[in-house]
C-alpha cells in the first residue's frame, strides 16, 4: 500500500479529547497496538537519533500504563510477524528510508519541513508484517513529537509524571486506519523559562528528587525535557538563580538536553549561554564592556567553544550580572553604542566557533525592561537576529512590531510571564492567569509578526501546569484556540485529566477560579505598594460579602468533586484543582476577615475578635493544605515543592510580608449616596436602565454592533473582571482618524434609559493592555445618539504608579463627561479608534455611584 499525502494536508493537528483516533474496538483496517493481551512491537533503527530511542521506550511504558501490557522495543525488523509500530526520522533511519525506497511510503511532502510528522497505517510494509503503524518525522523532534502524540491518543496525559495524572485503564488499543499528518508548528521555537526556583523546584530537586546531586541536575532536567516533547515544545531557558548551580556546572545537563533534542537558550540577562550569577567569578565591577571588553568577551567565548556543537539559541546583548542595568555607559546614547559593539563582537564569536554563516545561527535579543527603551531610541539589532518583545511581567505585552519591522529576516518573539518575582508585587504561589488573557495577548502578538520564539516564564513549573500547556498549544497551532471555542479548552483539559463525567463542572470551577483571581491575585491581597503604609482594600461591604460567599461556594464545589474522583485520580485532582481553589479561597477568607476585624476593633470588639479568630482559622487551614501537598500526596513525592509566600531578603520590597492580622486605623467610610428616584420604563424597552443614579453595562452585552470593511468588535469569553470583554478584530486593523469615526469606525451600541438629563461622568473599564503603537495610549471614542464622538485616551504609563495599580487591579480606566440631553431612551455608542483596546465595563454616574472596586452591578432590564 502506497501512502501519499500532500503538503496541503499537513495541518498543525493536535490530539483532542473529543476526537480520539485510538479506540478499544476493532474497526476496518485498524491497527491493533494492543489486543487480547498482546502488544505490537515497536521498531526503530539504531542509527536514528537518541531521542527516537528515548521516545520509543517511553511509548512502550505508556502502553503498559494503560493496558498492563508492555510492547517489545527493538532496533531491527528481522523476524517480525503480524504487525509492528515503525518509527523513524527521514534521512537518518534506514528502516524508514527503506520503506520510502521500496515505494511503501511517499514522504515528499514531509521533506524539508520543520518538526513535522505523520502517523499512518501501512499495509505490508516489511516481510512478515501485514500491517504497520508508521511514525515518520521530518527531523528528530518531529519523530519524537509523533511518538508522544500517539502516547497521548492512547490515553497518557503529558502531565502523567509532573501532575500524577493516572490514565484510564483499557484492554485493547486499536488505531483507526488512515494517515494523520501534523506540522509544521505555528511558532518555530516554543518553550519555557524555569525561574525564581528558590522556594519550589530547587529545594524539591535538591532534597527530594535528586539528592545525589543536591540541585536541579540531569535527572530533573530529563523530566523537564520529556515534558517539553510531550507538549510539542523544543526550547528551555534553564534555572538561573543563585541557589541553583549554573546549568553547565553539571556537564551531563547539556548532554541530556541534546539526547532529548531540546534547544537550550538563556534568559534576557544571560548572554551567550552564560549564567552570570554563578559563573562570573571576577569582581562584579569588572563585568563592564567599557572597561573590560576583552575579559568579558573571553568569558563568552569559552562557553561557545564548550557548547557550540549543540543546538542552541544564543542570547545577544548585555545587561547587568543579574536582572539589572548594564554597567559602564552613563547615557542612553552610550548604552546604544556599547550594545551595538557587543552585537558585533558576539556575532564574530559565533561565526568563528559555530558557523561562518552567522545568519544561520539562531540568535535572539530580548528587549526586556530598560532595554526596550534603548530599542525605541534607535538601537540597531542585526537583521537576522530575532527580537523578543517582553510583557510587563503581568501578562500584558509591551511592544509590537510595525509592518515595516515585520520584514526583518530574524522575525520576532515574545517573553511572557506566567509567574513573576519583582515590583510592584510578586506572584509565585498559585497560577491564576486566565487562559483568555494569554490568548488575547499571544494571538495579538502572533498577528503582529511574533512567530519565531515564544518563551513562558513558568516559575517552578508547578503549579503552572494549565497555563504552560495552553501557551504551548497556542505556539504549536495558532488556529486550535479561537474566540469562538476558548471555553472548550478547560473542558477538553478536564476530560483528558479526569474523564468526561465531571469535565464540564471541573471546567466551570476553574473558569470561576480564574475570574475571581483575575479580579485580584491571592498574592496581591494588599492594597498598598512597597514602601507605602498599609491601607484597606478598595472593596465595599457588598463586594467583600459577595467575594467571600463566592469563594466559599467554589471551594465546596471543588471539595465535592475531589471526593467523587476515583482513588487513582485524587492526588492529581488535589494538585491541579483542589489545592489551587482551596488555597485561593482560604487566602481571601484570611485577608478579608482579618481586614473586617481591624475595622471593627473599636466599635465592636467582640465581633472583631470573632472575625480575627476566623481569619486565623483560615490561615491554619491554608498551612494544613500546603502540608498535605508537600507531605502526603503521592507518598511525599512533592515534598518541599509548595511554599505559601516565597520570597527572600533580596526581594523583600516586592513581597507580602508573612501574614498577620491587618492593623488599620479605622476611618469613617464615605457615606453612601441616597437612593435616586426612578420612573417608569415603557413596555417593551430592552436595555440598560438607570438604577439608583447609575447605568452600569458589561461591555459584551451590547444591543447591536456595526462592522466596517471586515473589522468588528467581538466578544472574548473568559476575559474580564465581572464578565467577558470586547475587542476589535483583526488586531492588525489600521487606526482611524477621529474626524471620520461616524462613517468609518466599527461601533458598539447600547440602549439605555435615563431618569435624569445633564452631563454625567462616564468611566470605561479596560483590560490594562499596552497600545499597539508605543506612546499613543489606548484610544477609543464614545457618543450619545447622534452627538459627535468624543475620543478617550486611557494611558497608565508603563512602569508608573498608575500602571502598578492597573496590573494589580486588572483594569485601567478611561473617563469623560457624557451629555444626556433628555430623560428617556438613548443609544450609547462606542467607536474604534485603535485596535488593541479591550473593553470590560461601562459605568455612567448620574449622581448615585458609590465607592467600590469592581464598579456597580449591571443595571439591565432585559437583554
Task: Tell me what each language-model feature is.
Residues 50, 134-137, 198-218, 234-244, ...:
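The substrate-binding groove and active-site-proximal loops of carbohydrate-active enzymes
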Residues 73-75, 168-174, 241, 248, ...:
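Gly/Pro-rich turn-and-neighbor structural signature
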Residues 229, 234-237, 244, 252, ...:
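Structured mid-domain segments that build the active-site/substrate or prosthetic-cofactor binding neighborhood
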Residues 157-213, 219-239, 410-413, 686-689, ...:
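An acidic-aromatic substrate-binding cleft motif
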Residues 1-9:
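Bacterial N-terminal signal peptides
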Residues 650-651, 656-863:
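Extracytoplasmic
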Residues 14-184, 756:
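Contiguous, structured surface segment used for ligand recognition
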Residues 165, 169-171, 488-645, 737-738, ...:
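C-terminal non-catalytic alpha-helical accessory regions
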Amino acid at each position: 500500500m502506497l501512502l501519499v499525502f500532500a503538503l496541503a494536508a499537513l495541518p498543525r493537528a493536535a490530539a483532542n479529547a473529543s476526537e480520539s483516533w485510538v479506540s478499544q474496538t476493532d474497526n476496518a483496517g485498524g491497527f491493533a497496538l494492543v489486543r487480547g493481551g498482546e502488544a505490537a512491537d515497536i521498531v526503530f533503527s539504531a542509527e536514528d537519533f537518541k531521542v527516537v530511542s528515548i521516545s520509543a521506550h517511553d511509548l512502550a511504558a505508556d502502553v503498559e500504563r494503560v493496558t498492563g501490557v508492555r510492547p517489545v522495543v527493538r532496533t531491527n525488523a528481522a523476524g517480525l510477524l503480524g504487525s509492528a509500530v515503525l518509527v523513524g526520522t527521514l534521512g537518518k533511519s534506514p528502516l524508514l528510508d527503506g520503506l520510502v525506497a521500496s515505494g511503501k511510503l511517499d514522504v515528499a511532502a514531509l521533506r524539508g519541513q520543520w518538526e513535522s510528522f505523520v502517523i499512518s497505517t501501512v499495509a505490508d510494509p516489511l516481510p512478515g508484517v501485514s500491517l504497520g503503524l508508521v511514525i515518520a518525522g521530518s527531523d528528530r523532534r518531529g519523530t519524537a513529537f509523533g511518538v508522544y502524540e500517539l502516547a497521548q491518543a492512547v490515553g497518557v496525559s503529558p502531565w502523567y509524571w509532573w501532575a500524577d495524572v493516572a490514565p484510564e485503564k483499557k484492554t485493547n488499543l486499536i488505531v483507526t486506519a488512515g494517515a494523520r499528518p501534523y506540522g509544521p508548528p505555528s511558532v518555530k521555537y516554543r518553550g519555557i523559562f524555569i525561574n525564581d526556583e528558590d522556594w519550589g523546584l530547587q529545594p524539591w530537586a535538591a532534597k527530594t528528587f535528586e539528592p545525589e546531586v543536591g540541585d536541579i541536575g540531569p535527572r530533573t532536567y530529563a523530566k523537564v525535557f520529556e515534558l517539553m516533547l510531550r507538549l510539542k515544545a523544543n526550547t528551555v531557558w534553564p534555572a538561573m538563580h543563585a541557589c541553583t548551580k549554573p546549568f553547565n556546572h553539571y556537564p551531563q545537563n547539556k548532554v541530556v538536553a541534546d539526547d532529548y533534542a531540546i534547544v537550550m537558550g538563556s534568559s534576557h540577562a544571560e548572554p551567550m549561554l552564560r549564567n552570570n550569577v554563578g559563573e562570573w567569578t571576577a569582581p562584579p565591577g569588572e563585568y563592564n564592556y567599557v572597561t573590560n571588553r576583552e575579559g568579558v568577551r573571553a568569558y563568552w567565548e569559552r562557553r561557545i567553544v564548550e557548547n557550540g556543537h549543540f543546538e542552541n539559541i544564543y542570547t545577544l546583548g548585555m545587561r547587568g550580572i543579574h536582572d539589572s542595568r548594564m554597567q559602564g555607559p552613563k547615557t542612553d546614547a552610550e548604552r546604544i553604542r556599547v550594545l551595538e559593539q557587543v552585537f558585533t563582537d558576539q556575532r564574530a564569536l559565533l561565526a568563528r566557533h559555530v558557523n561562518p554563516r552567522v545568519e544561520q545561527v539562531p540568535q535572539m535579543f530580548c528587549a526586556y525592561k530598560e532595554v526596550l527603551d534603548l530599542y525605541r531610541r534607535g538601537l540597531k539589532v542585526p537583521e537576522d537576529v530575532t527580537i523578543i518583545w517582553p510583557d510587563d511581567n503581568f501578562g500584558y505585552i509591551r511592544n509590537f512590531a510595525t509592518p515595516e519591522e515585520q520584514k526583518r529576516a530574524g522575525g520576532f518573539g515574545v517573553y511572557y510571564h506566567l509567574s513573576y518575582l519583582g515590583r510592584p508585587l510578586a506572584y509565585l504561589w498559585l497560577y491564576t492567569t486566565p487562559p483568555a488573557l494569554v490568548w488575547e495577548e499571544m494571538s495579538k502578538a502572533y498577528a503582529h509578526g511574533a512567530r519565531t520564539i515564544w518563551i513562558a516564564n513558568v516559575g517552578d513549573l508547578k503549579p503552572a501546569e494549565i497555563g504552560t500547556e495552553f501557551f504551548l498549544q497556542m505556539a504549536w497551532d495558532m488556529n486550535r484556540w479561537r474566540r469562538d471555542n476558548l471555553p472548550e479548552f478547560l473542558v477538553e483539559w478536564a476530560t483528558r485529566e479526569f474523564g468526561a463525567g465531571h469535565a464540564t463542572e471541573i471546567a466551570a470551577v476553574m473558569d470561576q477560579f480564574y475570574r475571581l483571581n483575575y479580579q485580584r491575585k491571592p498574592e496581591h491581597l494588599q492594597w498598598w505598594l512597597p514602601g507605602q503604609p498599609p491601607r484597606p482594600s478598595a472593596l465595599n461591604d457588598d463586594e467583600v460579602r459577595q467575594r467571600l460567599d463566592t469563594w466559599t461556594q467554589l471551594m465546596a464545589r471543588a471539595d465535592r468533586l475531589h471526593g467523587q474522583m476515583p482513588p487513582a485520580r485524587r492526588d492529581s485532582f488535589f494538585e491541579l484543582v483542589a489545592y489551587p481553589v482551596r488555597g485561593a479561597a482560604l487566602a481571601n477568607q484570611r485577608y478579608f476577615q482579618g481586614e473586617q476585624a481591624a475595622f471593627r476593633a473599636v466599635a465592636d470588639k467582640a465581633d472583631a475578635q470573632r472575625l480575627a479568630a476566623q481569619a486565623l482559622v483560615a490561615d491554619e487551614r491554608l498551612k494544613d493544605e500546603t502540608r498535605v501537598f508537600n507531605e502526603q500526596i503521592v507518598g511525599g513525592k512533592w515534598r518541599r515543592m509548595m511554599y505559601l509566600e516565597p520570597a527572600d531578603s533580596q526581594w523583600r520590597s516586592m513581597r507580602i510580608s508573612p501574614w498577620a492580622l491587618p492593623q488599620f486605623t479605622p476611618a469613617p467610610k464615605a457615606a453612601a449616596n441616597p437612593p435616586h428616584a426612578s420612573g417608569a420604563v415603557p413596555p417593551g424597552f430592552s436595555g440598560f436602565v438607570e438604577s439608583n443614579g447609575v447605568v452600569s453595562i458589561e461591555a459584551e452585552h451590547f444591543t447591536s454592533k456595526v462592522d466596517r470593511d471586515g473589522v468588528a468588535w467581538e466578544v472574548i469569553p473568559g476575559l474580564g473582571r465581572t464578565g467577558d470583554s470586547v475587542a476589535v478584530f483583526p488586531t492588525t486593523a489600521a487606526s482611524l482618524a477621529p474626524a471620520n469615526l461616524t462613517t468609518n469606525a466599527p461601533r458598539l451600541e447600547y440602549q439605555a434609559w435615563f431618569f435624569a438629563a445633564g452631563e454625567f461622568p462616564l468611566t470605561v473599564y479596560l483590560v490594562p493592555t499596552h497600545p499597539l503603537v508605543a506612546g499613543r495610549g489606548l484610544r477609543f471614542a464614545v457618543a450619545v445618539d447622534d452627538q459627535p464622538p468624543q475620543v478617550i485616551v486611557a494611558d497608565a504609563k508603563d512602569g508608573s504608579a498608575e500602571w502598578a495599580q492597573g496590573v494589580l487591579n486588572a483594569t485601567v480606566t478611561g473617563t469623560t463627561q457624557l451629555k444626556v440631553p433628555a430623560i428617556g431612551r438613548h443609544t450609547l455608542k462606542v467607536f474604534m479608534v485603535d485596535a488593541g483596546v479591550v473593553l470590560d465595563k461601562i459605568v455612567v454616574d448620574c449622581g448615585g455611584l458609590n465607592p467600590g472596586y469592581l464598579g456597580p452591578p449591571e443595571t439591565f432590564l432585559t437583554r
